[in-house]
Amino acid sequence: MQAKTLADLYSDWDKVQAHAQAWQKRTLKDAFDADRNRAARYSVGAAGLELDFSKNHIDDETLQLLMGVADQANLKAAIKKLLRGDHVNNTEDRPALHSALRFQGKPQTAEHQEVKATLDKMAKLIKSVHSGEWKGYKGEKITDVVNIGIGGSDLGPRMITKALTPFHTGDVKVHFVANIDGAEIHDLTRGLNPSTTLFLVASKSFSTLETLENSLTARKWMLDNGCAQDQLAKHFVAISSKVEKAVEFGIAAENVYPIWDWVGGRYSLWSAIGMPIAFAIGMDNFNKLRAGAAAMDDHFAEAPLERNIPALMGLLMFWYSSCLGTDTQAILPYAYHLQLLPAYLQQLEMESNGKSVTKSGERVDYQTGSIVWGTEGTNGQHSFHQLLHQGTTMVPIDFIATLQAHHPLDHQHKFLFANCVAQSQALMTGRDQATSEAEMRAQGMSDEQIAELAPHKVHPGNRPSNTILMDKLTPETLGALIAAYEHKVYTLGVLWNINSFDQWGVELGKLLGTHVATAIDTTDIPSDWDSSTQTLVKKFTEANKNL
């Protein structure tokens, strides 16, 4: 079967490609020089965020062509399908109703009723633990809460908990364990008191290898430190759809919180999976986080595409990936507390859109999901920004910044923000050889020195970026930011005609990992495995034969 091309999807694709070729000869600097109102025209605000997308390789014709693509992809109709609960996850025949997790007002659907009941139950638990009413097996107040989960049960809650550090109530300390590497849980429990520790086991199936093994280790640690079997229920809560498995583990049925099939793991932080967030910042702030996301849902549903933040973010990334040949994007939050955001968005984007077949199963002949990476500013300036400025690869960037800080060190926040803006400006304008030569001449350097050094000081510029601003990092603005990226991912999936809500590649990795572990346990290595895999397993078996 012949692979699907974008020309098969979009009748004006030749015009889009021709326009992309024309942009190869243009510069952003010239675009700004020609239009004093460019920044104002290419900025849009909603839900406490402002997106400045003026430093992108676009003009009015670009946007017109991209809106044509969106129209042919039926993006507006697709948005309605997502938000009303149509089965947009076609390979698993499910809706993707993460927006229902943050509904506001009175419940309107059965899903809303389930969400409200779970939130009410969560609120009672958190109040009980924070107040000291909930006690451990020695009758002491819980001081530490440990979330055991991986992927969507870890990255989102961990990121949000770190991001909202200024809002921590201080009632308990929240920790996270994800890795199957025992070093993580071993190191963590060395600093905890078993009698005052509560574990949250977050696994929809209650069978995820990493989560189950870490939970078994946590249970053994409790038992080894004097907790009786019949007291374990005071130290374990589960978020799972498999109540019977959680009860068999030793968790009281009333302490099992639901997660539903209509929520994907990487979209689930708004549910009971977000319990560690609520333990850290309290239910009021958790609900503000949900409210911020709901405001972005409303914007996504109602705003025209040309003024729609998530749609524009998706269309711009489509432009770079599918038209201008980029295969990576950088997320650079200039906020220390957002240091885990790139890792969270890495999963959100790459697990969602790392697909190579259309929704109907046809191979694609075009690039889909891009590689997402980054770190917090200004740290990245002293590591990988060199490549962004002078490397041969064009990397579209999202700069994220706050206008105000939570801390009193205003002068440091000034420098943080200044560096964010300066980086986006420098990447756009660059520095030509004549300017570099003039600077060196002013420094008294000889013509010979200038000729030798000048080429190394040239910065080509013309590197694109978005800047996303918020007044302050709060539960509301963070909720809106995350929802914007969720909907950006969906927009891209619609434009590429792929399913953004399954993850069969992850499932294959889990299966093969189990097969290799069995081979290690039995020393029965299948002869039809490749020689590399056989050799690696033999080396591990030999190294551990006496343990």
Swiss-Prot record:
Q: In which pathway does it act?
A: Carbohydrate biosynthesis; gluconeogenesis; Carbohydrate degradation; glycolysis; D-glyceraldehyde 3-phosphate and glycerone phosphate from D-glucose: step 2/4
Please tell me one Gene Ontology term that the record gives under cellular component.
cytosol
One of its Pfam families is PGI
Q: What is the lineage of its organism?
A: Bacteria, Pseudomonadati, Pseudomonadota, Gammaproteobacteria, Cellvibrionales
What is the catalytic activity of this protein? Answer: alpha-D-glucose 6-phosphate = beta-D-fructose 6-phosphate
Classification via InterPro entries: G6P_Isomerase, G6P_Isomerase_C, Phosphoglucose_isomerase_CS, SIS_dom_sf, SIS_PGI_1, SIS_PGI_2
Q: Enumerate the GO terms in the molecular function aspect.
A: carbohydrate derivative binding; glucose-6-phosphate isomerase activity; monosaccharide binding
User: Where is it located?
Assistant: Cytoplasm
Q: Which residues form the active site?
A: 351, 382, 510
Recorded name of the encoding gene = pgi
Protein name in UniProt: Glucose-6-phosphate isomerase
**Which species is listed as the source?**
Saccharophagus degradans (strain 2-40 / ATCC 43961 / DSM 17024)
* Cytoplasm in keyword set: yes
